[in-house]
Every structure is written in C-alpha cells, then in structure tokens.
Amino acid sequence: MNLLIIGLPGAGKGTQAAKIVEEFGVAHISTGDMFRAAMANQTEMGRLAKSYIDKGELVPDEVTNGIVKERLAEDDIAEKGFLLDGYPRTIEQAHALDATLEELGLRLDGVINIKVDPSCLVERLSGRIINRKTGETFHKVFNPPVDYKEEDYYQREDDKPETVKRRLDVNMAQGEPILEHYRKLGLVTDIEGNQEITDVFADVEKALLELK
C-alpha cells in the first residue's frame, strides 16, 4: 500500500503516521529523515542537499525531488509500500512525485487528509507556555501548570496566535492545490481530526482497510 498523509501543522498528522506505520507495516518516509539519511550515506542528492544547507540556502525542488526518488527506489518500498509524510509541499512537487512513481512503476493508492478547523489549530498551537525558571513546557488549555502565575511564564514568538495564523495561512495556500490535484484523481479520504486520537485512527484504519 502506497500512501500520502496530509494535514496542517497541529492536526496530529505525525501521531497518525506513526500509528499507520505500526498497524500496516509500511515504510515511513518523512522529509527530515530522508534528508538526514541521504546526507549521512553521501548519496549524490544527499551531497547536493548538504552543499545548500551548509551555505544556509533553501534546498531547491529538484534536489528534494531527487532525494525522494532515491528513497522510493530502495528495495524495502517494493516489499512493504510507503507512507509519505511532509512531501509533496507544493503542487510542483506533487507533479514531480507523479512522474517519479510512474518511472519507478509504483502507484499511489490513497491520500489521507487529516482535517481540523484552522481556529482549533490556532488554539492548539498558540497555547504553549514555558516556565521561565525550569524551562518546562505547558499548554494553557490542554496541560496547564498547577500554580499558574502569568509572570512566571513566557511564550515563544513562534507560538503567538498571530504568528501561528500566518503559518497556517501559508500552509493552506500551498496545500489546497495539492489536495485538489489528488481529489481529481479520486485518491483523497478526509478524516475528521478534531476528536480523540484513538477515534481519529479508527477512521483512518477503516479508510485504509477499504483500500486494501
């Protein structure tokens, strides 16, 4: 089974990806892991990626696409299938993935889209606070400290609501064309992500069993 998992930051995509890998035995291919492995193994694309990263530059799409292609060509993919997590990030990468899969004789079986209302995600992502003395991390709503005093805690710039909202807006603008592309191919299953983790996975599992 060859899959993509898609979701906005905070939607719980990583948690569900780990559960899919555990339950269905597919190879988990995340962008970060791919880059680290390619650079550690000094593959052609890994060396290219490192040259950009060392200069503090963004890795261009053709290198990222090349690293994905190297990984999808490995033997375990044909045996186990894959779950791509964090790629494609743009419609151009989605088209490149289509071409790579065709070249390698692989087929995408499904796209799992973990849907959560953006306003809920702002609450999830902007609630993180850090204790000034201990460095411990809490959440205002989901994991509040016992003796909360506002002056004892601070919030990182990245976690402030306006910053979180901007980040989500960028992700939605990039993600919509990708979802539309896969919807036209009849591959997308929408999963309601604003429920208990076990309930989300029950819906994911049901969808994937129907694909088998």
Swiss-Prot record:
Species of provenance: Streptococcus pyogenes serotype M49 (strain NZ131)
Subunit and partners: Monomer.
E.C. number(s) listed in UniProt: 2.7.4.3
Keyword Transcription attached: no
Protein name: Adenylate kinase
Organism ancestry: Bacteria, Bacillati, Bacillota, Bacilli, Lactobacillales
Region listing for NMP, in residue ranges: 30-59
Broad enzyme group: transferase
GO cellular component: cytoplasm
Annotated metabolic or biological route of this protein: Purine metabolism; AMP biosynthesis via salvage pathway; AMP from ADP: step 1/1
Record note on domains: Consists of three domains, a large central CORE domain and two small peripheral domains, NMPbind and LID, which undergo movements during catalysis. The LID domain closes over the site of phosphoryl transfer upon ATP binding. Assembling and dissambling the active center during each catalytic cycle provides an effective means to prevent ATP hydrolysis.
Function: Catalyzes the reversible transfer of the terminal phosphate group between ATP and AMP. Plays an important role in cellular energy homeostasis and in adenine nucleotide metabolism.
Positions annotated to bind ATP: 10-15, 128, 137-138, 195
Region (LID): 127-159
Keywords: ATP-binding, Cytoplasm, Kinase, Nucleotide biosynthesis, Nucleotide-binding, Transferase
Catalyzed chemical reaction(s): AMP + ATP = 2 ADP
GO BP annotations listed: AMP salvage
